[in-house]
C-alpha cells in the first residue's frame, strides 16, 4: 500500500475514518473555511483504508472541537475517529457517537414546524443509526440521512 505523505501538526485535531466524499461536508459544518487563528486545514480525500476501502481525513491545526461539533461530525460520519494532537503526539483518541437525542444542531425539514418560526431549540430523537433516521420532537417529522445532511 502507498505511504500517505502529509505533514504532522503540532497542536490540533485530526478527524479520521470519514466516508470517502464526506470530508468537504465535515469542513463545511465545522466552518473551517472561516478559521481566524491562522491554522492550516488539510483535507485528504479518497485515501486507501483497510476498514472503509476509501476514506477522507481532515486535519485542523490549532483548533480543538467542542462536544456540539463532535456530534455534528457523528451525523455526517458516524464511524469517524477524532485524534487530539499536542506537541506532535496523539494525546486522546475517541470514536464519535450519534447521541440518542440531538438538540440545537439540526434544523427541521418541515417548513411548518414551530422551530422554523419561533425561537425554539430544535430537538430530535434518533430512531435508527444504520441508516441514520431521526424524528422531530415538535412536529414528529422523520428525516433520513440526505435530509439530515441538508439541514445541518
Curated annotation (Swiss-Prot):
<dbReference type="Pfam" id="PF02748">
    <property type="entry name" value="PyrI_C"/>
</dbReference>
<keyword id="KW-0665">Pyrimidine biosynthesis</keyword>
<feature type="binding site">
    <location>
        <position position="136"/>
    </location>
    <ligand>
        <name>Zn(2+)</name>
    </ligand>
</feature>
<feature type="binding site">
    <location>
        <position position="139"/>
    </location>
    <ligand>
        <name>Zn(2+)</name>
    </ligand>
</feature>
<comment type="similarity">
    <text>Belongs to the PyrI family.</text>
</comment>
<dbReference type="GO" id="GO:0046872">
    <property type="term" value="F:metal ion binding"/>
</dbReference>
<dbReference type="InterPro" id="IPR036793">
    <property type="entry name" value="Asp_carbatrfase_reg_N_sf"/>
</dbReference>
<dbReference type="Pfam" id="PF01948">
    <property type="entry name" value="PyrI"/>
</dbReference>
<comment type="function">
    <text>Involved in allosteric regulation of aspartate carbamoyltransferase.</text>
</comment>
<dbReference type="InterPro" id="IPR036792">
    <property type="entry name" value="Asp_carbatrfase_reg_C_sf"/>
</dbReference>
<dbReference type="InterPro" id="IPR020545">
    <property type="entry name" value="Asp_carbamoyltransf_reg_N"/>
</dbReference>
<feature type="binding site">
    <location>
        <position position="108"/>
    </location>
    <ligand>
        <name>Zn(2+)</name>
    </ligand>
</feature>
<dbReference type="InterPro" id="IPR002801">
    <property type="entry name" value="Asp_carbamoylTrfase_reg"/>
</dbReference>
<dbReference type="GO" id="GO:0006207">
    <property type="term" value="P:'de novo' pyrimidine nucleobase biosynthetic process"/>
</dbReference>
<dbReference type="GO" id="GO:0006221">
    <property type="term" value="P:pyrimidine nucleotide biosynthetic process"/>
</dbReference>
<dbReference type="GO" id="GO:0009347">
    <property type="term" value="C:aspartate carbamoyltransferase complex"/>
</dbReference>
<keyword id="KW-0862">Zinc</keyword>
<keyword id="KW-0479">Metal-binding</keyword>
<dbReference type="InterPro" id="IPR020542">
    <property type="entry name" value="Asp_carbamoyltrfase_reg_C"/>
</dbReference>
<feature type="binding site">
    <location>
        <position position="113"/>
    </location>
    <ligand>
        <name>Zn(2+)</name>
    </ligand>
</feature>
<protein>
    <recommendedName>
        <fullName>Aspartate carbamoyltransferase regulatory chain</fullName>
    </recommendedName>
</protein>
<comment type="subunit">
    <text>Contains catalytic and regulatory chains.</text>
</comment>
Amino acid at each position: 500500500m502507498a505511504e500517505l505523505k502529509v505533514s504532522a501538526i503540532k497542536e490540533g485535531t485530526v478527524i479520521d475514518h470519514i466516508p470517502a466524499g464526506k470530508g468537504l461536508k465535515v469542513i463545511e459544518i465545522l466552518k473551517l473555511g472561516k478559521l481566524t487563528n491562522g491554522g492550516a486545514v488539510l483535507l485528504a480525500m479518497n485515501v486507501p483504508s483497510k476498514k472503509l476501502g476509501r476514506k477522507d481525513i481532515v486535519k485542523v491545526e490549532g483548533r480543538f472541537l467542542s462536544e456540539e461539533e463532535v456530534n455534528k461530525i457523528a451525523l455526517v460520519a458516524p464511524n469517524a475517529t477524532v485524534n487530539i494532537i499536542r506537541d506532535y503526539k496523539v494525546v486522546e483518541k475517541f470514536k464519535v457517537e450519534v447521541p440518542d437525542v440531538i438538540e440545537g444542531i439540526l434544523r427541521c425539514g418541515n417548513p411548518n414546524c414551530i422551530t422554523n418560526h419561533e425561537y425554539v431549540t430544535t430537538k430530535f430523537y434518533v430512531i435508527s443509526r444504520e441508516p441514520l433516521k431521526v424524528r422531530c420532537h415538535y412536529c414528529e417529522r422523520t428525516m433520513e440521512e440526505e435530509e439530515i445532511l441538508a439541514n445541518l
